[in-house]
């Protein structure tokens, strides 16, 4: 198991995300589904050029809500990540230059465009979640990994027993955001933001 800080210079990122990034917290779902779609399209590309052996099946994205546990999960069957890739993409790349950028743009009206510039889409999860887990297994032979962060700059990263390729992001929904545990709310958001996605999305029965 490894523990660490995401980046010493970005300890103010989380409050900035909550306060400034989006006045509309609902956009987190669009960002997570977009990331899941990218991971799945990359898998299909690797398969098409022969870098991935075997049948990848018909990968889909699944959204699950567990009201008793107060969690919302976004699950894909895409390329997944190794532990090293989680460290690189979640803990380092996503924060590259973000603090300075957010400070510059936090008073502007075009806040909805900020996230894509720095790969911060994943971190919009913390607008509605008090804790976020990533469980992921790469298409490579590396063991699966589990990353946990409670909205502070500190995280834990461990090996995990996951057999199937892909990534599951589990949001432990904050008490102020329980609307995102309602099926009707999620259906509305998927209709609004993710209606014409190239990968099928499953939610509900």
Where are these regions (language model features)?
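GHKL (Bergerat-fold) ATPase N-terminal catalytic module, capturing the glycine-rich phosphate-binding loop
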Residues: 1-175, 179-180, 188
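TRNA-binding/sensing appendages of the translation machinery
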Residues: 194
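A short amphipathic beta-strand at an alpha->beta junction
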Residues: 198-205
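Charged, low-complexity intrinsically disordered tails
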Residues: 182-183, 187, 197
């Amino acid at each position: 198991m490894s523990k660490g800080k995401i980046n010493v210079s970005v300890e103010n990122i989380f409050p900035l995300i909550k306060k400034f990034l989006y006045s509309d917290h609902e956009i987190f779902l669009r960002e997570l589904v977009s990331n899941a779609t990218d991971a799945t399209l990359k898998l299909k590309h690797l398969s098409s050029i022969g870098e991935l052996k075997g049948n990848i099946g018909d990968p889909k994205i699944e959204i699950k809500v567990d009201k008793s546990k107060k969690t919302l999960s976004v699950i894909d069957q895409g390329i997944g990540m190794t532990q090293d890739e989680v460290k690189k993409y979640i803990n380092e790349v996503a924060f590259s230059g973000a603090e300075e950028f957010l400070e510059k743009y936090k008073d502007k009206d075009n806040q909805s465009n900020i996230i894509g510039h720095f790969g911060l889409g994943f971190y919009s999860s913390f607008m509605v979640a008090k804790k976020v887990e990533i469980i992921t297994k790469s298409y490579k032979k590396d063991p699966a990994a589990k990353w946990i962060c409670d909205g502070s700059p500190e995280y834990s990263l461990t090996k995990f027993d996951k057999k199937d390729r892909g990534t599951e992001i589990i949001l432990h929904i904050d008490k102020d955001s329980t609307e995102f545990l309602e099926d009707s709310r999620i259906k509305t958001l998927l209709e609004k933001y993710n209606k014409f996605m190239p990968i099928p999305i499953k939610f509900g029965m």
